[in-house]
């Protein structure tokens, strides 16, 4: 069995030195725009449509949500999965999400908020860049989450 041991010459880092270490300028993310243009909402760059999400079952639907808003280029399979697994809120309640805009907005706002709170961004402009880029990546299906968020 392998074991790790401390090397005599290895530096010891006090716990105090680790607190807020991420706010050091050289440790910031340094986010640049690649998929977005300043002042333009990534959601406004694509065509949207209202459709129904439906997963059939043997005798009745396993899942159904009518009137959901999705990018026009997303498949019906993506619509069904996202509406069933990723939209938050009880079905037929006012809190129930009904648009990819709501779902991605919720996720992006949460992650960008964590970045702001953790000092990952140099300034608010960088935080807004990060949020816009993540929104564009997700809505254009360049990346997705592995589990419901």
What are these language model-derived features?
Residues 1-149:
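Extended catalytic cores of very large enzyme megasubunits
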């Amino acid at each position: 069995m392998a074991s790790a041991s401390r090397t005599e010459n290895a530096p010891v880092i006090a716990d105090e030195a680790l607190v807020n270490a991420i706010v050091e300028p050289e440790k910031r993310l340094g986010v640049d725009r690649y998929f977005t243009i300043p002042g333009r909402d990534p959601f406004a760059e694509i065509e949207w449509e209202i459709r129904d999400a439906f997963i059939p079952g043997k005798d009745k639907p396993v899942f159904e949500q009518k009137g959901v808003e999705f990018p026009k280029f997303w498949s019906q399979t993506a619509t069904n999965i996202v509406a069933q697994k990723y939209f938050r809120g009880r079905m037929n309640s006012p809190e129930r999400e009904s648009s990819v805009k709501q779902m991605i907005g919720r996720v992006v706002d949460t992650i960008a908020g964590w970045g702001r709170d953790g000092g990952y961004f140099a300034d608010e402009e960088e935080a807004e860049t990060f949020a816009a880029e993540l929104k564009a990546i997700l809505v254009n299906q360049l990346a997705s989450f592995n589990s419901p968020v």
